[in-house]
A protein has these predicted regions:
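Post-cleavage N-terminal segment of exported redox proteins
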Residues: 2-41, 226-231, 249-266
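Structural motif marking the loop-to-transmembrane transition
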Residues: 3-10, 236-244
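Electrostatic cytochrome c docking/interface patches
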Residues: 29-52, 63-74, 82, 228-236
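Sequence/structural segment immediately N-terminal to covalent heme-attachment motifs in c-type
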Residues: 42-64, 220, 237-245, 249-253
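Extracytoplasmic/secreted proteins, especially bacterial periplasmic and envelope-associated proteins
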Residues: 45, 49, 53, 116, ...
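Sec-exported extracytoplasmic/periplasmic mature domains
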Residues: 55, 59-66, 122, 134-138, ...
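Electron-transfer interface patches adjacent to heme c in soluble/periplasmic c-type cytochromes
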Residues: 77-186, 191-213
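Short, aromatic-rich amphipathic segments at membrane interfaces
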Residues: 202-241
Length: 266
């Protein structure tokens, strides 16, 4: 009886260990029905490109007060590269990332203060951000002239419209937006492409392909995930070492210890 209980306890321990990684990944991905984005924090080229997009476009209005410029060395950038290409609001590489726009002006022009983006990926999830940055469309009823399929009534104008192009909402005979159901049954505006951008192109049949823009946004989101927890690069390496130790050392020891304890039990 005791041997059976011991065996069941070991099974439960292994099951919990194997479930830990996918469960944590599910929590980090955020809720909602959004297309899955491929996040790879080992891809330094993607992280560096994402950092460039962030500092060139996002940092104009949004701060990242929990992130210092010198942490970008962790993704393979030198101090000279950081100062030359990514720093526009300070000369000190040890400073935190502060928005170029005054928060009071941002509140006045946009109707709400732009949120700090340090932890936005941990708060909203990578898939949400990926969908959000591809969901902008022209909406003349909004103060900024823009709206978003993911966050209706968003006060943020499209910062990357030159890269993506311009989507606009289709209107019915009464001048009201035409609404359709998406694959999940949610009502969403029916959009059409008014123009393409630097990273999208229109085929002869009229269909617009934006694979290049999708990759562009993926790099930005990849960086936002990294920025939310820069230490996770090291944490992942340590985690693999711990798991290797558990399976290569502790598991055999536990097995032989169990055999020694129960060798006289019949």
């Amino acid at each position: 009886m005791r041997a059976a209980k011991m065996k069941q306890a070991l099974k439960n321990w292994f099951a919990a260990l194997l479930l830990a990684v996918p469960m944590s990944a599910a929590v980090a991905s955020g809720g909602g029905h959004y297309e899955k984005v491929d996040i790879d924090l080992r891809d330094q080229v993607s992280l560096q490109h994402g950092a460039q997009i962030f500092t060139n476009y996002c940092l104009s209005c949004h701060s990242a007060s929990g992130m210092r410029f010198n942490r970008l060395k962790d993704i393979g950038l030198t101090e000279d590269e950081i100062k030359k290409n990514l720093m526009f609001t300070t000369d000190n590489v040890g400073d935190v990332m502060v928005a170029a726009m005054d928060p009071k002006d941002a509140s006045k022009w946009l109707g709400a203060p732009p949120p700090d983006l340090t932890l936005i990926a941990r708060s909203k999830g990578a898939d949400y951000l990926y969908a959000y940055m591809r969901g902008f469309y022209k909406d003349p009823t909004r103060p900024t002239g823009w709206n978003n399929t993911v966050l209706a009534g968003a006060s943020m104008p499209h910062p990357l419209w030159q890269q993506q192009g311009v989507q606009a909402v289709e209107l019915d005979a009464k001048g009201q937006p035409v609404m359709i159901k998406d694959e999940h049954g949610n009502l969403t505006p029916k959009l059409y492409w008014e123009s393409t951008g630097l990273h999208s192109r229109r085929l002869p049949n009229g269909k617009v392909i934006q694979k290049e823009y999708d990759a562009y946004v993926r790099d930005l989101v990849n960086y936002l995930v990294y920025m939310g927890e820069p230490a996770q690069l090291q944490r992942h390496r340590i985690g693999y070492m711990v798991l290797t130790f558990l399976f290569a050392v502790m598991l055999p020891l536990a097995y032989f210890l169990k055999k020694e304890f129960w060798k006289d039990v019949h």
